[in-house]
Amino acid sequence: MNRLLTAASGLALLMGGIGAVQAALSLPVAQPKAANLARMRAESLNGGLASYRAAACMYETGASSCLISKSEQGFLFGFLGGPPGWQQQSPPRPTLETRILVSQDGERILAVPYNGPIP
């Protein structure tokens, strides 16, 4: 009985994980790399992790929720940020907005059209 329960639990976990894997596989290969590069640039521009955290969407695989556009120019990400803990406040109180354009291959920052106070 325990073996059956263990096998059923493992299968359920595996099936749940398949959805996440399929979602990640549908992303262009360069998108997660581009998202990580954009997030790290924002962290660097805004004083490092000791004083800045990007929005949670930038920590998702590929940051699809923060992706403004994907074109021949590259990946344009737009997201909020602020001091550590800003998203846990009620309501959340971001202090900065950042837009970063990353090359199509996810290797280079092409532009930082905006990084500053929330307009």
Question: How does the language model describe each region?
Answer:
Residues 12, 27, 66-68:
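Residues embedded in well-ordered secondary-structure elements
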